[in-house]
Amino acid sequence: MECRVTTARLEISDFPRPAVARSLSPNGRVHWAQKHLARTAVHQRVWLEAFIQQLPKMRGLVVIRPTFTYPIERRRDIDNACTGVLKHAIDALVRGAWLVDDSLEYVRLEPPVVCVKPGVRSLVLEFETSDVVTDRQLPSVAESSVPAAQVGSTSQPRGRR
């Protein structure tokens, strides 16, 4: 069996908006409802872009190379962008089944690259994996779940003893 390395790319333009990035930053002090709205906005935008750009579903170890592009040059703490926006972007890819899981077993996150281009704000995620699957290769929920007869069963009968 031949093992090929496949690279995929997800480019999200005009993202992240400053208000969203501030809300999701670990240093941000916002109300929980505002943080929830920001997290939901990131999940929806990433899911939509992955769907539109036909990002392939990946399994196995995936290396992710994030590139943040900002419109103006200034001092930035990139750790805040990674722990805020990038965490929720990866969570959205897991929820949409583009990634199996975001644990160390499945995802390696490389240090982010920061670029400055006047008038451009974007997040580019480059994925490198050795295993890309189509929808037909993914097991269905019925195939991977425990049979209904075994759910909730115990080795001992119920009742008083």
Residue ranges with predicted function:
Residues 1-161:
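Catalytic phosphate/metal-binding cores of nucleic-acid and nucleotide-processing enzymes, i.e., regions
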